[in-house]
Amino acid sequence: MDPLKAQQLAAELEVEMMADMYNRMTGACHKKCVPPHYKEAELSKGESVCLDRCVSKYLDIHERMGKKLTELSLQDEELMRKMQQGVSST
């Protein structure tokens, strides 16, 4: 595959993944923090604080999971490299 096309595809996938994460986060936090029947047009103080905390936690967990998955991926790559070296040296 052409490197430019691969880079473009990776960028498109990243945008799609970020949009998916945003949609899940807003849906989950809205469901948790905002009652289904609105009393007022504006968010209450409690709803606003709840949404702020929910989004903060969601983003924190997303970042932690990304770091852990990267770490595991690097470990897998290292293991595969060692296995290939072991096979090629015999």
From Swiss-Prot:
Pfam families: zf-Tim10_DDP (PF02953). Its main location: mitochondrion. GO terms for molecular function: metal ion binding. It is a peripheral membrane protein. Disulfide bonds join 29-54, 33-50. InterPro entries: Tim10-like (IPR004217), Tim10-like_dom_sf (IPR035427). The lineage of its organism: Eukaryota, Metazoa, Chordata, Craniata, Vertebrata. A motif (Twin CX3C motif) lies at residues 29-54. Keywords: Chaperone, Disulfide bond, Membrane, Metal-binding, Mitochondrion, Mitochondrion inner membrane, Protein transport, Translocation, Transport, Zinc. This is Mitochondrial import inner membrane translocase subunit Tim10. SUPFAM superfamilies: Tim10-like (SSF144122). The twin CX3C motif contains 4 conserved Cys residues that form 2 disulfide bonds in the mitochondrial intermembrane space. However, during the transit of TIMM10 from cytoplasm into mitochondrion, the Cys residues probably coordinate zinc, thereby preventing folding and allowing its transfer across mitochondrial outer membrane. GO terms for cellular component: mitochondrial inner membrane. The keyword Thylakoid does not apply. Gene3D superfamilies: Mitochondrial import inner membrane translocase subunit tim13 like domains. It is found in: Mitochondrion inner membrane. GO terms for biological process: protein insertion into mitochondrial inner membrane. Belongs to the small Tim family. Heterohexamer; composed of 3 copies of TIMM9 and 3 copies of TIMM10/TIM10A, named soluble 70 kDa complex. The complex forms a 6-bladed alpha-propeller structure and associates with the TIMM22 component of the TIM22 complex. Interacts with multi-pass transmembrane proteins in transit. Mitochondrial intermembrane chaperone that participates in the import and insertion of multi-pass transmembrane proteins into the mitochondrial inner membrane. May also be required for the transfer of beta-barrel precursors from the TOM complex to the sorting and assembly machinery (SAM complex) of the outer membrane. Acts as a chaperone-like protein that protects the hydrophobic precursors from aggregation and guide them through the mitochondrial intermembrane space.
